[in-house]
Amino acid sequence: MTSRKNLFYIVIDALRWDVLHDYNSAKAIMPNVAELMALGFTRKVIANSQSTQFVMPSLFSLTYPLDHGGYNTGIRNRPKSYVEVVKEAGYSTNLISTCNQLGAHFGYDRGFD
């Protein structure tokens, strides 16, 4: 049986790239996240907006904020999210969030165990 690698997708709202751009900076601020970074890889990404309400639908569904009825409905009316794709591939999926904008009401329960 072939073992597959774990997949972690971590989004930290309002955390700037320049704060965690290298391992030493990350280790000083968030040592556990720094250890995860050392085991995998990171990408510098640029958000398409300044607001969580606009950005999260885009991150989850790879669509623009105003696509599929706008941003007020989260991902309810959007195409399949990346979470649903990895779930269909056999991965366990979990969401840990304190953000009220990532709730089931906005469709963010789609694809999570």
Regions found by a protein language model. Name each.
Residues 4-6, 17-113:
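Active-site-proximal alpha/beta segments of enzymes that process anionic O-linked groups
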